[in-house]
Amino acid sequence: AQVIGADTAGHRRLVDKGFTHVVDLQEQAAAAFIPVKLEKPFKSLQKGRMEKKQLTSGDPSGFKPLKSTHERYAEVFRRLGYHAKPGPGDILKGEAWPKNFDDGMAQSGQLRVGLAPFAAHAGKCYPEPQMKELIQLLGAVPHIRLYLFGGGQREIEVLGSWEEAYPYCKSVAGKIPLTEELALISNLRLMISMDSGNGHLAAMYGLPVLTLWGVTHPYAGFAPFNQPEANSILANRKKYPAIPTSVYGNKVPEGYENVMESIPAKGVYNRVLEILQESQI
């Protein structure tokens, strides 16, 4: 990849590269000037901003599933004439267990489950008391091993304390580079995630991803790739009818601070057991 400025000199360099098409995958107005200068076919991502605005307006008539983000990206290339139809087989190949992460737990026959308990916004994070309840429930499952994912000093400290408290937990946070984290993820049986990046990374390897949704909702099109509806566990919309309050979870209206408390840990646990049983068939 190479970054080329959008000025006149940059346009000349693009011409020299011999490009035949221009694609804007950010739906940025400035990008429209590039194909004008280059006189090349141009297609832009359609994010569906108006649809998403209606979805997050609180108006019941706007509450309907929107096109997935994966499909929106594929659509751009189809409009250029390419075959782009993401399917179940479009996943990354699994990698070897990272050599630099010999935790004494990665033995054959064990159920390796990832747990990514954090997200960019508080309205998308499962409360710590319920997360600990879930961890304790999962700890009773024979041969289970939980690998904890996060980043940043505070998350590293929290996950480290959980590792000390629960012998079947191992924190990955801050211990190995991203490339090795990805290799580790590819060896898991399941990823439990918030509406956050770790779930998407796991889905890239074809893993089952169980996502817990707070003030956001999969109808906005950001559910991990190729996951069944049953793998989305939602906050109670009867109690919190304004969900989704925003697309990214950065807006938490008054009274919606504790939406994720409406997701019982036992319900998450039961779905984990179902997924693990399904993967053994």
Q: Language-model segments: which ranges?
A:
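Catalytic machinery of carbohydrate-active enzymes
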Residues: 1-281
